Amino acid sequence: MEAYIRQKRATPGMVQASDMQLVRPMSAVNRNGREVHAYDGPMQFMMSPNNPDQILTSTGNASITTTPTSPYSDAPLEKLTPSSQDSEDEESTPVDILPSSNSFDSTRHSADHLLTHSAPISPALMNNNGGSHHDSSSGKSVEHSSPQASGHNDTEGDVVGPIEQWVTQPAPQGVLYKCRITRDRKGMDRGLFPIYYLHLERDYGKKVFCLAGRKRKKSKTSNYIISCDPTDLSRQADGFVGKLRSNVFGTTFFVYDSGKKEDHGNPRLDLAVVIYDTNILGFKGPRNMTVLLPGMTEDDQRVKISSADGQQGLLDSWKSKNMDNVVELHNKTPIWNDETQSYVLNFHGRVTQASVKNFQLVHDSDPDYIVMQFGRTSDDIFTMDFRYPLCAFQAFAIALSSFDGKLACE
């Protein structure tokens, strides 16, 4: 099984930013002067001691495999090529930022169902807009956002009120929060159980601490405690906000608030469910994920949904097609670039390295409205931007689910 996983992960399933460009290198293997439009070696991100995502180092070499060119998209994209100094076993490939006229923080969706305060966020209302999602797997091209299509003049958000309350409040409509996640793997046991810190980015390089999360050491499944107090990551801490828990296979993650399951007076609420598509047959490509959120009321408050005490939670509602109070999001389909031999997405300068973790969340009715985007900028630093209807806690938990190992998904 270990050899199978190594061979499968040797293929380039990473997602790069399409708005980046590098000086084209010459391959060390190719010595006839011909330029190559791909990574200089496979991305064996589970087999290198220098790999930024590696927790338990392992040794051995995996055979080099190639991914056939996909004819899915013919959209013009900018070229990305790796640095000649990169290790061929690293998952990440640094790229240089090009000046971008359309930045992520300047986009704002113009659809009434997302920016009109009187409209609730629910699939019943969203689906009435007649939007369609173009999936590259079906042979159709993915539509690209433009300044006219995605709007403009989003306000950059800031912390309002006590941090314990702000992190669970849905983002106001028309406000963009630009955050950074730092992974701390220093210390005796942080190689296995790193601590993740969420900061809200401010002007002039300043940042405001928001949340911290860490996987519990003694748990049958992946279980992350998320708190506003970075010094006490426990359920008993005053800063405890909620938790992220996975199933046995690591394919489904549940986000709960700080309530207790057995407390009938104040039951634990479902705040999100993250579902990763299984990949048992070993198909190559980036991860596919579905995110379920509680619906929004007309005054922009979340509908209370709880799976405690046998009630129908988010996942049960989704399985039974009862979507009246559930919002369903999907990762935006990356486009295969023949020239770089990789999948690309336009992160508008916020993501600078290729990674299988990079993603953007959209609703099928309007793929131009980026609800959340997450991606790598260095070995242990990631950017996380989110909008309405997400809150900081929900977005942070969704990002943490991307860090966790998924044997059946890769």
Swiss-Prot record:
Q: Does the keyword Metal-binding apply?
A: no
Q: Which GO CC terms are listed, alphabetically? A: cilium; cytoplasm; nucleus
Q: Where is this region: Disordered?
A: 48-109, 121-159
Write out the annotated subcellular location.
Cytoplasm; Nucleus
Q: Where is the composition biased (Polar residues)?
A: 48-72
Give the domain of life: Eukaryota
- Encoding gene per record: king-tubby2
Instruction: List, alphabetically, the InterPro entries matched.
Output: Tubby-like_C, Tubby_C, Tubby_C_CS
User: Which family does the similarity line name?
Assistant: Belongs to the TUB family.
Q: What is this protein called?
A: Protein king tubby 2
Q: Is Cell inner membrane there in the keyword field?
A: no
**Bias (Basic and acidic residues):** 132-143
* Example of a GO biological process term: protein localization to cilium
Task: List the keywords (alphabetical).
Answer: Cytoplasm, Nucleus
